[in-house]
Regions:
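N-terminal secretory signal peptides and thylakoid transit peptides that target proteins
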Residues: 1-13
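Carbohydrate-interacting regions of secretory-pathway proteins
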Residues: 18-199
Length: 199
């Protein structure tokens, strides 16, 4: 009897990601599929999107060309402080969007990164769990938007769970970089950014 050998090949991350509905938001090398607003400077370095202020401390936004209403986004972020940045979602304009904030608590009375900001309303929900923020390294963030239900998890902790119907979407996902001399030298690094549509 002839012996048959079977070889099992592990599923690659790219295939597994596609099968579970997750899609990368950038290719790790270029900013293809993104558009810029404002004068901030954006580049891809070592597989991460890096944002810096433009001349004179100018602000700016980097936004996906595609839009979603209901979705989950995962990413990792790291900040060179002092800084004020965030992850836009359901973005239509700077006056019509939600943002998962990435900010220095000393500028906002102890409000921490991972708080939910709504343009026109300030903070809809505040994160005050210091254990959820790694100030000196990478932070894993997960944003879920399903109708009015908005959730933010950071480093394995659920830091925001609320309901708000101000911006139902669809809109872009993006990265915000704040203006101001007080944030001179700021760098926001974002990597491993992917999305799963819930529509």
């Amino acid at each position: 009897m002839k012996r048959r050998e079977f070889f099992f090949v592990p599923i690659t991350g790219a295939v597994a990601s596609a099968e579970s509905g997750w899609l990368p938001l950038y290719d790790g090398r270029t900013l293809q599929g993104w558009r810029q607003e404002g004068k901030a400077l954006w580049a891809v370095k070592d597989g991460a999107i890096v944002g810096r202020q433009g001349p004179g401390g100018a602000a700016g936004d980097l936004l996906t060309e595609k839009q979603w209403a209901n979705f989950e986004v995962e990413l990792e972020w790291r900040m060179k402080w002092p800084g004020n940045s965030g992850i836009w979602f359901r973005y239509v304009s700077a006056q019509s969007s939600y943002q998962a904030d990435i900010l220095d608590p000393s500028d906002h009375s102890g409000v921490l990164s991972g708080s939910l900001y709504c343009t026109g309303k300030a903070f809809v929900a505040e994160n005050r769990d210091a254990a959820s923020v790694n100030r000196d390294g990478w932070n894993k963030m997960r944003i879920r938007a399903m109708g009015e239900e908005l959730t933010i998890e950071q480093n394995g902790k659920r830091v925001v769970q609320t309901r708000d119907k101000t911006f139902p979407g669809p809109g872009s996902v993006g990265i915000q970089l704040h203006a101001g001399k007080s944030f001179e030298g700021m760098e926001i690094h974002v990597r491993k950014m992917r999305i799963r549509s819930l529509d």
